[in-house]
Structures are given as C-alpha cells and as structure tokens.
Amino acid sequence: MNENSRLHTHSNIRNTFFSEIGIGISGNSFLLLFHIIKFFRGHRPRLTDLPIGLLSLIHLLMLLVAAVIATDIFISWRGWNDIICKFLVYLYRSLRGLSLCTTSMLSVLQAIILSPRSYCLAKFKRKSSHNISCAIIFLSVLYMSISSHLLISITATPNLTMNDFLYVSQSCSLLPLSYLMQSIYSTLLVLREVFLIGLMVLSTSYMVALLYMHRKQAQNLQGTSLSLKASAEQRATQTILMLMTFFVLMSIFDSIVSCSRTMFLDDPTSYSIHIFVMHIYATVSPFVFISTEKHIVNILRG
C-alpha cells in the first residue's frame, strides 16, 4: 500500500469512527435526558428504568473518553504524560466493565420481571431493583480491581522504539507484562466474561422459554386481556433479547479481533478498526431503547 492509499484509508477510518462516536453520544444523551425528565415529573418508574438510565450514562461517558483517546490516535499533537495516559485508559476500561456488568444485570432483571407469580424467581421482584443495584456495584468494584494493573502497565511513549510495546495511542502504550502476570490477568478476564455472558445466555434462554409458554397460552385462551398482556411482555422482552444477542456477538467478535491483534498484527490501522467495533453496541443500544418508549415514539410521530 503506497503512502497516498494509506493516508486515504486512515482518513476514512477516522471519519467513520468519529461519526459513530457522535451518533452514540447523541443517542445516549437523549435517552439519559428522557429518563431524568421522567423521574422529575414524578412518573411511576419501571424496574428497568434505573439500569437503562445507568447504562446510557455509562455509554455516554465511555464514548466521550473514547473520543478524547481517539484524538491522540488520529490527530498528531504534542502528546500526553504518564498521568493522563493512565487516567484515561483506566477510566475507559472501567467504563467498559461497567457496561458489561449493567447489561448482564439488565438481562437478569428482565427475566425476573417476566417470571409468573408461581415461579421462584418471582419472589425477587419486590427487591429486584435494590439487589440488581448492589450486584452492579459489587461487580464494578471487582472489575476495577482486576483492571488496576493498567495504572502500572500504561505509560507515555512519545517515541516507540521497542516492538514489545502494545500500541494504545500516539502518546500511550502498554508495557509488556511478565508471563505469570499476563496469565493471571487473562484468566481473570476470561472468568469475568464467561460468568457475565453466561448469565446473559441463561436469562435469555429462560425468557425465550417463557415467551413460548405465553404464546401457547394466549393461543389456547380466547380472552383478550391475556393476549394484550402477553404482547406487552413480548415487546419489552424482545428488546432485551435483541440487545443481549447483539452484545454477545459483538463481545465474541471483539475478543477475536483483540486476540488476533495481540498475537499477529499490531499497528494503528488495525487498532482503529478494533476500537470502531468495540463501540458499536454503545452506539446502537440507546436507539433500540428509544424505539420502545411509547412517549418518545408518539412525540416523534406527532
């Protein structure tokens, strides 16, 4: 690839990435503002309102931090020092962990809400909001502890002269870890991913089974009230199911790209493509939630 082609490719990736970030920031800002206005107007909150509002706030902050880091990838300037590099990268990774934790807990919460009264999960409905909040806090603190090694391994490297450094941005890079530390960190991350994504898969499978039962029951009964109720539950649950499926697929694809980049190819272009993939979920999710809000849809149609 000649220099002109390389610059053209770099420019296209930059424009695409910043467009993605801009769309994601707009969508999450709108969704967060909607939930804030809804809260202050005294509307009766749904059990899912808190995690959805929290998720939009997390994604908003994550995309803002990603935009700042991206300026150091696509735009040449004087660079950052060690403190700025450590702070931004650690904050970004922590927000990504929060996104995973909140998404997983949202899936579990929706499964609890959908459970019939005769099911054991229905017992958690009354305290589900409090329990989910505590679980999110616990998992977030745990993940931030796992990611604390970044405060040591991230460093400012204006002039990279060693191939062992892993590219993060023009000013920041990741110092190589010892084999033992890398193994411990990788194991902890894998356990975290398996646990949280496993919760999503279990809760998603549970909801699919319940929806199937609702559908069969609605077909057997002639009453309209049950059909309407089942339809409302279907709409809410299908939104979560779609997001969970999309999130799991993006997580798997992100892991594949990340591993291939670490093992085979490490350059600014491949990294730029990687960070574009990482933010697809944060960009798309607010619009999925917005499309299910009747108040917003009615206003937009009017």
UniProtKB/Swiss-Prot annotation:
Consequence of gene loss (knockout): Mice lacking all but one V1ra and V1rb gene (12% of the V1r repertoire) show a lack of chemosensory response to a subset of known pheromonal ligands and changes in maternal aggression as well as male reproductive behavior.
Cytoplasmic-facing ranges: 38-49, 115-131, 215-238, 291-302
GO MF assignments: pheromone receptor activity
PROSITE patterns: G_PROTEIN_RECEP_F1_2
Positions of glycan attachment: N159
BP GO terms, sorted: response to pheromone; sensory perception of chemical stimulus
Membrane topology: Multi-pass membrane protein
Chief site of localization: membrane
Keywords noted in UniProt: Cell membrane, Disulfide bond, G-protein coupled receptor, Glycoprotein, Membrane, Pheromone response, Receptor, Transducer, Transmembrane, Transmembrane helix
Transmembrane segments: 17-37, 50-70, 92-114, 132-152, 194-214, 239-259, 270-290
Cystine pairings recorded for this chain: C85-C172
InterPro entries xref list: GPCR_Rhodpsn_7TM, Vmron_rcpt_1
Subcellular locations according to the entry: Cell membrane
Leader peptide range in chain numbering: none
Positions in the Extracellular compartment: 1-16, 71-91, 153-193, 260-269
Gene3D superfamilies for the chain: Rhodopsin 7-helix transmembrane proteins
GO CC terms: plasma membrane
PANTHER family for this protein: VOMERONASAL TYPE-1 RECEPTOR (PTHR24062)
Family, as annotated: Belongs to the G-protein coupled receptor 1 family.
Annotated function: Putative pheromone receptor implicated in the regulation of social and reproductive behavior.
Name used for this protein in its record: Vomeronasal type-1 receptor 48
